[in-house]
């Protein structure tokens, strides 16, 4: 087994210790495939790679990285589905006790969860690198160019290529944290000395539900009107808006919120509707309109 070290110039976006993880394997089977390469980037910029040079070294590799992953906050791209379960399954295969991480953050899962408030349409790492203008200097131009290799193919023909690909996967996963931060900032509402942070927006039939948190803490609160209800418990809020589905213009089907309370903002959608009709969803959420509705309702509570 070999170990490679490097240092990457990064800033600690979260002001806490974390690692960015990516693995390369010989296939998708957790029984018949092996972990070939593990890349780890620490929040202080230290980058380390472990790669097996013999078929029997996987067990040693897993023992080594288990110590690095235990009790850590692990950031991945699709790692909740692939990387972390794969590592743990291979550890169990070798009779090892799988590590227990502190927590995980899967960037791909996060972006899919928030897809209706962004204009992101494709969620492969390569497509997101293009979307967020992240560079990758290696011979693999497309995700499909990276095949699963047998150990002999990996060792004899593609060793350096796979190591480089893994390194860029790790580094560019880190760079996608900047996109995550931009999305999180777009969901914040500042009102007086308070910050209202939207966590999720969903709709079902005639109800648009918005969940989030308020800081600093405020007292519990509940109010219900003709077209909305708001519940605040332990500074977490749930706002339900009554919405209607209809054609906003010829061929454009969407949802609007009908308001009967004063609104002092301009509709950000391109549709010329009555002033009491605020578009909230057409293929994607109109986040600006939704934030303004939230802000208007909270103005009577946070003074």
Regions flagged by a language model, labelled:
Residues 1-33, 42-303:
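DEDD superfamily 3′-5′ metal-dependent exonuclease/proofreading module
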